[in-house]
Amino acid sequence: KKNCAAISSSLSAKIYKLNILAEQIEDYKNNMTRFYVIGKQKNSISGNDKTSIAFAAKDRVGILYKCLEPFAKNKISLSKIESRPYKNVAWNYVFFIDFFGHIDDPKIQAVLKKLDNYCSFIKYLGSYPVCCDI
C-alpha cells in the first residue's frame, strides 16, 4: 500500500515484498521496540487488557505521588512509567504510563477522573489486549 511504513526484520520485508529504506536502525544493542496498531476504533474489553495514557502533572510538591496514588488505592498495577521533558513548559514533564485495565472499565474511569484533578492534560493513547510476557 502507498503511504504505509513498517519497522520489521529483513525476513519480513522479503516475505511481504517490501522495500527496505533503512537497516539496523537501533541505537542500542539490546533494545526492545514497542509496536503500535493505530486505528479509529476502540478495542472492546477482553478481560486481559492494558491501557496507555500520557499526562502532564501540575507543578506541585509531591504531585507524582498524588497522580499515582489512585492507581495504588484501586489495586491497578502499572506496567510501565516514563517521563519526557514537556516542550511547552520548562522543567515540567509528560508522563507515559501503561497499566492493567481497559478505559471502559468503571474502576479505570474513576481513577482517571481523580488523576484529572492533578493534571494540565491527560491523553488516552489506547486500550488493548495483553499480548504476552517478555
Residue ranges and their predicted role:
Residues 1-134:
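Domain-level signature for soluble enzymes in the chorismate/prephenate branch of the shikimate pathway
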